Amino acid sequence: MAEPKSFNIPYRSKLTERIEPGQTLIIRGKTIDESKRFNINLHKDSPDFSGNDVPLHLSIRFDEGKIVYNAYTKGTWGKEERAKNPIKKGDDFDIRIRAHDSKFQVSINHKEVKNFEHRIPLNSVSHLSIDGDVVLNHVQWGGKYYPVPYESGIAADGLVPGKTLVVYGTPEKKAKKFNINLLKKNGDIALHFNPRFDEKANGFMCAKPTPGSVVRNSLVNGEWGNEEREGKNPFERLTAFDLEIRNEEFAFQIFVNGERFASYAHRVDPHDIAGLQIQGDIELTGIQVVNNQPAQE
């Protein structure tokens, strides 16, 4: 469930369903140069501080250079847990809160920064509020725990031109590779997208600790075609990513974390993509099929 627009602050929202373990709340926005602090709260029963419990309170503080984590229960604030604030004034940010059975896992700008143990049962969360010195432009929650390897059909007409596959995930600590396959009904692979961490990209001497290449290919009538490997590997171990594969009439347009990565000309009929496979050293947090959005310059 996504709301891709700007929001008034303070922001208040009632969740249409209770948060389940494995789901992720994604919040994107921008701080202002005069920011002192802003807050993200997960509430029980009402999106305010009228006395009901607050299972999670995040206070991003620029005046202290800290992020404060806490919970409010039975009319009392608990003990604060403090950590360094990695967000700078005036910067864009991406904050993710993933729910687990025993904790909230918090990531900022795709890096995990905190595990906050539940003090109030997860199933009590019903509302979200955001307030303070912040510009808010994206709120989304969803996902689940996915098995890997993962295989599924694509609903309705499949991934036809005009549709985008969005994959949210994190390469494992010792990841060597993972792959995403878009399948035709006959089992051919329209697109094999294969980030590899144990190879060097063509034309690049990689100094990062996780160098690699990203192989693109197709399997047609049981035979692999010519590999395409241009470009650095934009994926890093233990760093979350958003991968968009947009199906257009003549090619797949591939974006990683909102940045254009590659274009892959169709080698098979782009109207006949009916299945998805994901394999390898990856933790999946979300999969969506949405309508294509205009490319960002």
UniProtKB/Swiss-Prot annotation:
UniProt keyword terms in alphabetical order: Lectin, Repeat
Residues noted as binding a beta-D-galactoside in the record, renumbered to the chain: W224, G225, N226, E227, E228, R229, E230
Function: Binds galactose.
Keyword Repressor attached: no
Domain Galectin: 11-142, 151-290
Keyword Repeat part of the UniProt annotation: yes
Stored SMART domains: Gal-bind_lectin, GLECT
InterPro entries in the record: ConA-like_dom_sf, Galectin-like, Galectin_CRD
UniProt source species: Caenorhabditis elegans
GO molecular function: carbohydrate binding; galactoside binding
Protein name per UniProt: 32 kDa beta-galactoside-binding lectin lec-3
Gene Ontology cellular-component terms listed: plasma membrane
